[in-house]
Amino acid sequence: MENVQSRMQGSRIPGLKEMNPSGTNARSRLPQPGAIANKPTAVPQLARTRSTTESTRIGAGPPSAARSVNGATKAHTRANSYANSSTLTRSASAASRPRGPLSSSTSGRPKTSMSTSRRPNGHALPRPATSLDTHQEERSYGGLGKRGEWDQDEREQNLESLFETFVSRISQQGQESSGLKDALEVYKSRVGELEEAKSEQTEQNIRLKVELDVSKSRLAEAEDALKNAQRDHEIAIDELMSRQRAECESVRYESQKSLDALKAQHESELKELRRQFERELEDEKCARVRELNQLHSKTALDAQLSQIELDKTIKELAATREDLQSLRTELDRERKNTNNLRQNLDTAASNSVTLESTISALKARIEFLESGREEQSEAFERLNQQMMDAMAETNAAKEKLRREETLRRKLHNQVQELKGNIRVFCRVRPTLENEGASDAAQFTYPDEGEDSKEINIIGPEEKSSFGTVTRKNHNFSFDHVFGPSAQNSDVFDEISQLVQSALDGYNVCIFCYGQTGSGKTHTMSSLDGMIPRAVHQIYETATSLEEKGWRYTMEGNFVEVYNENLNDLLGKAEELDKKKLEIRHDMQRGKTTITDATTVQLESPEMVESLLKRAAANRSVAATKANERSSRSHSIFILKLIGENYITGERSEGTLNLVDLAGSERLSHSGATGDRLKETQNINRSLSCLGDVIAALGQGKKDGHIPYRNSKLTYLLQFSLGGNSKTLMFVMVSPLQAHLSETLTSLKFATKVHNTHIGTAKKQTRVRDV
């Protein structure tokens, strides 16, 4: 009795586990639930999952709380019958195991055909809402069971009611078993096929597993070897790095020590040599200037005398030519008369008898005319000799003029060399209308009325820690200083001699350097700037040299360096950044060409004005905090001058480069961001490269490296910055106090350039074979 009660208390529904469905249901010989599903299968996992899901969906059924509590029969389809039968079989099989003494005599089928049991009527407890309340429900049912242990009749009554319920449901399931048999046969055949596929899949899985194990072992060995090699490599690298650091430190210490000693010795020697050289140079300059002044005055006087003699000779030659022409006309007339007389003489010969007197007269006349012709011939020969002498004198005068022109070019080049092959001019722009006078810094020009070579800048007031207010003076000296009142015409008067050197066959480079907004573009590219004035002077000089046998052809290019890329400013606007221009150098001839760049034949100065307008429209400009129209690129106007003297066969090739550099600026002042930031960085980088090139040229080393290739700007101007050229730098400064720091930086760089000597320029001429 106690055993039965304990079994009833362990079951959720009293009396369920004590019933044996195999003893009650005659059709309980079906396989154990899950036997088919648990068999090995060779089909893919997807099909197996689908089958399992479908079986679960069919056999799960709604929860028992949703079923009828009075045990009413519910209709099923064929698929539902099969699923319910399978679930019932599993429940019956699970309940058929021995549970105690009561299980041998009492048995029963599950209450429903689904996998979940129906709740019993009467005193059966309701199923919990969730599976988490199982223990609580069992505790509640255990309490009822304990109360039922003292009432044997009540227990028997419960068992009988349960038995009657099971019997009714078993009879209901018997009607559904026929459909389940047919489904079972179908599934048995399917199970056979699946078992065969499973065996094949199992063999394949075993083979793949063996291969995977082999691969894993090889991979593990390779990883171990790699880790060992990496560890050895890291150890070796650490040793090498430590050894190298030690060696570098020792070498650096020794080098610094020797360098300091050499530097001190070199500075002392350099100071002494510089003092001696400056003294000698000053003496030599004075002597050369005196000689040049004498030569200039003598040359000018000789040229004047030669010109006067030449004019006189030309006038005499013209008069002689006129006399000769009149004599020739008279001689022709006399010859015609003679011919007429001879004809008359022939006619009169037939009438000799009657015309003897006439013949005598005619003979006398003929003799007279013949004697006059001899005198005329002698006069003609005398005039012809005078003309030949005059032409010889004219040729001698022209040859003397050509020699004087050659001497002038030589003396002109010597003067330019004495002034320095690299010269620096400083120009201070005037204040604009929107800039007040109070905003200007204090500039003074100590020698403004004399040589105009010095500029003095008074810095702002600075208060020391002791309370003393001081001002710092900054003194600079250049080849020429132009104040705010200077015009472009005054500036061009100083550089016109360099333009003449380009006509003589030298490479000349004139470039403007300075911060943004300091007036570089106005100085170079305005309508009265250096570029138009230089072209006008070249045309005027070339025209005057035509009578000395020179013929010049001129061609120009206009390009810009924008973000280290070359753009053709004379090309089409839509192709500005699409054409790829390349720089080609002919090292033997010292010539530079730009591929695919537009080359324009300059036939008149007016063409230059149209070219400047087109280039200004294509040039890259943008607004910054420092300048509302700031040039964002370096523009280079390249003018090639090819001259040929058809008398002497001499040929000259010169190049004039007029460069308008983009404004140097500090990022903190310009406030550039985005594209403007990139432009500013490229501008400052190229200007720094220009300074490096000039510094390297100033060292004067014969085989020293000159970093032309560090920037497109310096690479393009390679032959115009080297020793075979004449270079002029304009440093443009702003007069405003707010720009004082940038002004001082520009002037210091200009001083560095001014102290640089780049060698002697070479004339590019050759004599044509005549």
Swiss-Prot record:
Q: Give TM regions.
A: none
Principal place of residence: cytoplasm
User: From which residue to which does any coiled coil extend?
Assistant: 175-425
From the UniProt record, report the name of the gene that encodes this protein.
klpA
The record's subcellular locations are:
Cytoplasm, Cytoskeleton
Origin organism is Emericella nidulans (strain FGSC A4 / ATCC 38163 / CBS 112.46 / NRRL 194 / M139) (Aspergillus nidulans)
Name the residue ranges with Low complexity bias: 85-105
Boundaries of each Kinesin motor domain copy? 421-756
Please note every region of biased composition (Polar residues): 106-119
- Quote the InterPro entries the UniProt record gives: Kinesin-like_fam, Kinesin_motor_CS, Kinesin_motor_dom, Kinesin_motor_dom_sf, P-loop_NTPase
Q: What family, per the record? A: Belongs to the TRAFAC class myosin-kinesin ATPase superfamily. Kinesin family. NCD subfamily.
For bias type Basic and acidic residues, the affected ranges are 134-152
UniProt keywords, alphabetically = ATP-binding, Coiled coil, Cytoplasm, Cytoskeleton, Microtubule, Motor protein, Nucleotide-binding
A GO MF annotation of the entry reads: ATP hydrolysis activity
Give the UniProt entry's GO cellular component terms. Answer: astral microtubule; cortical microtubule; cytoplasm; kinesin complex; kinetochore; meiotic spindle pole; microtubule; microtubule minus-end
Cite the residue spans of the region called Disordered: 1-152
Q: Which GO terms describe its biological process?
A: cytoplasmic microtubule organization; establishment or maintenance of microtubule cytoskeleton polarity; karyogamy involved in conjugation with cellular fusion; meiotic centromere clustering; meiotic spindle formation (spindle phase two); microtubule anchoring at mitotic spindle pole body; microtubule bundle formation; microtubule-based movement
Which residues does the record give as ATP binding sites? 514-521
Q: What is this protein called?
A: Kinesin-like protein klpA
